[in-house]
Amino acid sequence: MISKTKNQYLKQLAEKIFIEDKNFAREFKVHSAAKSVHHGYIGGLLEHSLSVAKICESYASLYPQLNRDLIVMCALWHDMGKVEELSSFPENDYTDEGQLVGHIVMGAIKLDRLIREIPGFPPKLANEVKHCMLAHHGELEFGSPKKPALLEAIALSQADNLDAKMETFAEIMEKQKEDQEWSGFQRLLDTRIRKTSI
């Protein structure tokens, strides 16, 4: 995905995050995406990030008005703050900074620092990248400091939500007994759920 990126600044930023920073890259590959909600297992963060990036890649092919490089690269690093928000396994619990600041702001701070290290990084693009990070939960009540104001930020928040819900559903169904059609009430989905009949 990074190799297909045409924008030199976004490509440089992705390489700084995932290739040059070997410690971060190693942690990112084995970290969970959550404590318990979705992808809360070893490698869950990488799996979730790649899934969101693939969804965004498909959005970009369906909707040519989306900037492919911006949405796919932002999808790859949208949850990078989780590496510091959550402790490593076996604890997989919130750190003090994670509790007080949260992964969205932590990720945006790290992105800002890395962007400043890239000579000539366009200020408008820098703001668009940071906005996608800050708005990726879509709504203020879901923890986003900003509501999406760019098409790419809207699409990213939808892709993130879709992948989280699909994984949550799969994890619930995996725990169901073979002969049990319906789950109990699921607070995270605000409903009971069942598998399709075919």
What feature does the model see in each segment?
Residues H136-G138, E178-R187:
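Short, mixed-charge aromatic SLiMs
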Residues S58-Q176:
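Divalent metal-dependent catalytic cores for phosphoryl transfer on phosphate-bearing substrates
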Residues K22, Q176-D179:
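Generic detection of intrinsically disordered/low-complexity segments and helix-coil linkers/edges
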Residues L10-K11, D21, A126-N127, E152, ...:
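Alpha-helix initiation and N-capping motif
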Residues M1-T5, K16-I17, C132, Q158, ...:
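Residues that form generic nucleotide/phosphate-binding pockets
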Residues M1-G98, E139:
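Acidic/His-rich, divalent-metal-binding segments that scaffold phosphate/diphosphate chemistry
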Residues S157, W182-R187, T196-I198:
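N-terminal intrinsically disordered, cationic/polar leader segments
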